[in-house]
Amino acid sequence: MSKVIGKVSQIIGPVVDVVFNGKDVELPKIYDSLEITKKDGTLLVLEVQSHIGENTVRTISMDSTDGLSRGYEVVGTGNPIKMPIGADVYGRLFNVIGDAIDGLGNLPKDGDNGMSIHRQAPRFEDLSTSSEVLFTGIKVIDLIEPYSKGGKIGLFGGAGVGKTVLIQELINNIAKGHGGLSVFAGVGERTREGNDLLREMLESGIIKYGDDFMHSMENGGWDLSKVDMPGMRESKATFVFGQMNEPPGARARVALSGLSIAEYFRDGAGSDQGKDVLFFVDNIFRFTQAGSEVSALLGRMPSAVGYQPTLATEMGAMQERITSTNKGSITSVQAVYVPADDLTDPAPATTFAHLDATTVLSRKIAELGIYPAVDPLDSTSRILTPQILGDEHYDCAQRVKEILQKYKQLQDIIAILGMEELSEEDKLSVSRARRVQRFLSQPFHVAEQFTGLKGVLVDIKDTIKGFNMIIDGELDHLPEAAFNLKGTIEEAIEAGEKMLAEA
C-alpha cells in the first residue's frame, strides 16, 4: 500500500491540522499515527483525533511542536501508536510512543513485535472475578480498606499529603513480595521521582542491569556499556514515562501506553501463558488534565469546571481495560490528585466509580503528624465483609471505625467546651480513639531517610491484636506518644514502658 502523504496546514500549540490533497486520497483513520521528520532529523509523531471537512485531519502531537512550520510533509503510518512487546521489554524504560529512554537502544515495534495502545476492553465472558485479599503490610490499609487481588485501587489526596510515597511503599512491599511482573506508568509527575524509582528497583533487584553495572553505580557512575543485556530479561518490571515537562498529547496517552504492556503481560502471546501483573499509575489525574488542556483546541465545548465533555467516556474506556481475565490478572494501584482537596471535583469523582478500594489521604491527618495520612472514615473497600475477611478482622475494623467516628462527633464539643465537660465514658473513648489514631501510623521503608526509623511490614494478625488491646482498654496507662510511628503493639508497649520509667 502506498503511503499517504499530507502537509501541515495549521499549528496551535500541541494541536496540528494536516491537509491531504489529491484525488482519491484516503484520509488516515481516527487514532492512526502520522509522522513528521523535522529538519534536524528527529521524528515527531501525531495522533489523528478528528476529520474536518473533506481533506483535513486534526491531530495531537506527542512531542513539542517547537520549530515546526506550515508546509512540513506528514506521512501516514496506517497504524495507531504501538508499544514494543516480547521478552526484551523487561527492565526497560519507554516513552509514550514506545521509544526507549534508558539509552539502551530502541526495540522493534513493527508487525508482531508491537501492540496498539488503543484496544477494546476484554469481553464480558472473558472476565474473571475473585475475592482474594492482597495484604500490603500497611496496618491502616490491611485493616480498614483491604485491597483485592486483581482489583483496582485508588489513592486520593491533594498536593503534598503523601500519594507518591505511599505508592512507592506499595511497590516496595507488593512488587518485592509478589515475585510477578510490574508495570509503572509515570503520567505527568516529577522526572526526579522516576529516576529515584529506577535506582530503587535496581538496588532491590527487581530490575537487573548486571553486577558490573551495579559496581559502577555504587561508585557514583552510570556506565550503560556495562549493562548485561541478556541478563536484563530476568527483570520483573517495565517503566513507561510521560512526565510533567511533556506536552499534553504525551500525558494524555502515556497511561494507555503503559496499560498496553500490562495487558500483554496479562494475556500472554502464543506460547506465553498469561500472568498476574501489578500496574502502578502515578498520577491518573494528569491523564484527565492533559485531555482538558487540548479539549478546547480540538474544538470541543468545555463541560463542568472546564473539563472536556468526554471526561467520563475517556476514563471509562481506559479503566475498563484494567481488569482481570481468565488468562491472568491486573491489580492496579492508581494515585489520584485531588484539586484543592475537593473530592467532588469531576476528575476524582469520575475515577471513584471504577475502583474496588479507595484510600483517601487527608491533610488534617497529615497536620497531626500521622503518616501514612489515610482517613480511615473516608476510605472504602468492596471486600470489607465478614464472608471474605472473617469475623475477627471485620469486627476489629468496625470497632476502630466506630471509636474514631465517636471521637469525630465529640470534637466540636471539645473545641467549644473543653474535655472537662465530657462524661467519664466519653473521656475514655476519646483517649482510646487518640491512641488508635496514632497507632494507625507506621514507619515506611521508602521514608527511612526522612523519619530516621526503620520501615516495617505488619502482619494482619498483629494489627488486629494491637487494635483490640487498645479498644479493650488494656493499654490505657501508656502515654499517647508511645503509639506514634510504631509497627507492632509490642513496640508501642516497649516505648510506653520506657517513657513511664523516664517520667
Curated annotation (Swiss-Prot):
Keywords: ATP synthesis, ATP-binding, Cell inner membrane, Cell membrane, CF(1), Hydrogen ion transport, Ion transport, Membrane, Nucleotide-binding, Translocase, Transport. It is found in: Cell inner membrane. One of its GO terms (cellular component) is proton-transporting ATP synthase complex. Its EC number is 7.1.2.2. It catalyses: ATP + H2O + 4 H(+)(in) = ADP + phosphate + 5 H(+)(out). It is a peripheral membrane protein. GO terms for molecular function: ATP binding; ATP hydrolysis activity; proton-transporting ATP synthase activity, rotational mechanism. Pfam families: ATP-synt_ab, ATP-synt_ab_N, ATP-synt_VA_C. ATP binds at residues 157-164. F-type ATPases have 2 components, CF(1) - the catalytic core - and CF(0) - the membrane proton channel. CF(1) has five subunits: alpha(3), beta(3), gamma(1), delta(1), epsilon(1). CF(0) has three main subunits: a(1), b(2) and c(9-12). The alpha and beta chains form an alternating ring which encloses part of the gamma chain. CF(1) is attached to CF(0) by a central stalk formed by the gamma and epsilon chains, while a peripheral stalk is formed by the delta and b chains. Produces ATP from ADP in the presence of a proton gradient across the membrane. The catalytic sites are hosted primarily by the beta subunits. PANTHER family: ATP SYNTHASE, ATP SYNTHASE SUBUNIT BETA, MITOCHONDRIAL. Belongs to the ATPase alpha/beta chains family. This is ATP synthase subunit beta. The gene is atpD.
